[in-house]
Each structure stands twice: as C-alpha cells, then as structure tokens.
Amino acid sequence: MAKTIQAIRGMNDCATTESPLWQWVESNVRNVLASYGYSEVRMPIVESTPLFARAIGEVTDVVSKEMYTFWDNDEQLTLRPEGTAGCVRAAIQHGWIYNNEQRLWYMGPMFRHERPQKGRYRQFHQAGVEVFGIANPEIDAELILLTARLWQALGIEQHLSLQLNSIGSLAARANYRAALVDFLANHTALMNDEEKERLVKNPLRILDTKNQALQAVLNDAPKLLDYLDEESRQHFAQLCQLLDAMGIRYEVNPKLVRGLDYYNKTVFEWVTSALGSQGTVCGGGRYDGLVEQLGGHATQGVGFAIGLERLVLLVQEVNKTMSLPKAVDIYLVYAGDNTTLKAFQIAEQIRNALPQLRVMTHCSGGNFKKQFKRADKVEAKIALVIGESELATQTIVLKELQNSSEQISIDQADLLAELSKRF
C-alpha cells in the first residue's frame, strides 16, 4: 500500500462537523459588515515580496522570520502573511482611493511560518477591514463599534475586552524610542538574545515581551502617551470621548504597540482570557502613511483584522451547548422500478418552490433500511419516501426523523403546501 500523505504541520483541514460553525461565524461577520455599508474586495494570496518588506517593515518578526517566500524565475514572491498591504496595493493599482473614500472588507487565508499551537497556525484565516480617506477619529470609533456589534451577534461580548493606545506620529515615536532605549540599556542583563536584537532593531516590540522580569522593569519605563504630538493627543482624546458616550468599555494600555511598523496614532486589540496565551482575537489601528509609502497619493487609512480560528475557538469555548442548523432538511428515499425519476423530479420541485430548504437525494441504491440509516447519519429532519405503491397512487410518505415518529401519506400534489407548514 502506498504511503499516505499528511497535511503540512500547522495547516489544518476543516471537516464537515466543523464547517457549519465556520459558516455561521463567517455569515455573522458578513451581515454585520453589510449593516455598516462596507464592500467586499478579493486579493491574491501571493504578492511580490518587496510589498511586505516595505509595508510591514524589514526588521519585524513577520518579514524577517515568518514569511513563506520563493522565487518565480527572477521575481521573489510571498504567500501573504496579512491582508492590509495587499489591499493597499490593490487600491493604489486600480485607483479605488484616488480622491475617494472607501470602506472595504475581505476574508481569506494568510500564511506565517510560526510554531503551531492552539489558536496559532501556519495557515490561518482573517476577516479584515480597511477604510481609506477619512482622517477624523469618528471612523476609528465606528470600527470599534462594528466589532463590538459582531461580538454581540456571536454571543461572546462578555468574554472580550478592549485595549486601546495611541502610538502617535513617526516623529513622536522616534523621540520615545530614544528614551526607551536609554532606559532599557541599563537592564540588558534581563534580556535574552531575541530581546537584545529587538532593542537594536525594533525596541518598541519589547513592550509586549512575555519575559516577566522585564515586564516588571517596564512598569517604570517612559510612557509612550507622554511623548505624543498634540495632533495625536487630541485625536486619541476625541476617540475616547466617543467610546465613552457610546458605552464602550476599554482599558488604555500604554504598552500596546502592535507588531507591524505601518501603524500610527490609534492602535487597539480585543483580547480574551478564555483561550490561554493566544488571547488577541482582533487587532488594528491607523496607518495614515502607508498608502504614500507604497507609491500612492497621501491617503489616511485605518483598519483591523480578526483571527477567524481564534474567533471560532472562542465561540466554541463560551457556547458549548449551541445548536447549529443541520446540513439536511429533507432526505429523498426511493426504491423500486421507475422511482428514481420521480424522486429527482420531486427534489427539484422542492428546491424551486422552497429554495431555503436543504434537500438531499439518496443516489446510492440499496433497500429502504439502508437509506434510512443514511438519512439518520446526515441528521435529516424529514424523509420523503417513494416506492412502487406511491408511484402508482401518486402519493408520497412523509416521515419525521428528529422530533417525533410521525409518518403520513399525502398526495404528491399537496407536498409543497405540507412542507411550507413544517419549515
């Protein structure tokens, strides 16, 4: 027997038992985004490698350690590790944002070469939102309100908390970076090799270290909020006022900086304690310089991304008894000469008249007992049975499979009316 081939480590299959929950979560995401007037876009999963190096930053962990990159003839390509850079590239290329506001969303797989663990995978999925051309803090607030509404729709609002910060302008961060490096230079004995490298290349990333001893020292470090430029300070104050007025609870976290270099001003994360160490379910912020950095006209930007694997895990964790719609409403059971055509005709009539119903035709042969076992396996609600006697009398047997043992025989002409009453 030939050796079987397994999925790549950290890249997972989604089974039929799992996909209904994924579909339900994704449907809620789409519905909430539509209710705010956002439009879907779709981008390639492969982009030119320099796009991510320029957008995310060459000294970030994502670009320096985690990207899947390969050569195609003389061009270096990368499986996208996140969605913002590709969305900005597409917006510039196709003129979506030239003198124009846009509120966009996308959903799909991303790829990072990380150590796989619960809630962190090498292929993972994100729902991302990007808004272009709006400078004021009202749009920052709208994105946070949008995510809060999604948590309510999913029944997880009590298990997520909002962390908020402002990282100011590029100049403000440069001043803060210098002060932070001066402070940390006296504590290098507490750092491992990776943290020492970050101190040189990207010192703000040390603020979210998992090193407990270093975290204790950072409590006395200079605070980024103290170095904000006046415009960023006012922007952040107005955002906080809006959130207060709308009843959104949040914690100002002065150590929150996000892991990508393109952010400025507002940054935020929705976090949970229900998933262990992988507690960030949604993160985002402003990137007002990114469009120009990638060759477009100066255009303000703000957005967020939701990790769908973590979102699905959280829904499972806090709603252990939730019941999702079954995959099949009606199962067509038929046996005997000439019953196949009639079963197919009836199935298509139901689909035409009641398109919301999920109708499965058996197709596999066998006796009635075998077919009913299959109907039970797919958890169908109702079986419709056609045998030679039903064919001769133009009747059909309707049998309840879930909530009762009811079984009735009705005229085929009355079937659609009967199903309309039951569904």
Swiss-Prot record:
It catalyses: tRNA(His) + L-histidine + ATP = L-histidyl-tRNA(His) + AMP + diphosphate + H(+). GO terms for cellular component: cytoplasm. GO terms for molecular function: ATP binding; histidine-tRNA ligase activity. Gene3D superfamilies: Anticodon-binding domain, Bira Bifunctional Protein, Domain 2. Its EC number is 6.1.1.21. Belongs to the class-II aminoacyl-tRNA synthetase family. PANTHER family: HISTIDINE--TRNA LIGASE, MITOCHONDRIAL-RELATED, HISTIDYL-TRNA SYNTHETASE. This is Histidine--tRNA ligase. It comes from Haemophilus ducreyi (strain 35000HP / ATCC 700724). The lineage of its organism: Bacteria, Pseudomonadati, Pseudomonadota, Gammaproteobacteria, Pasteurellales.
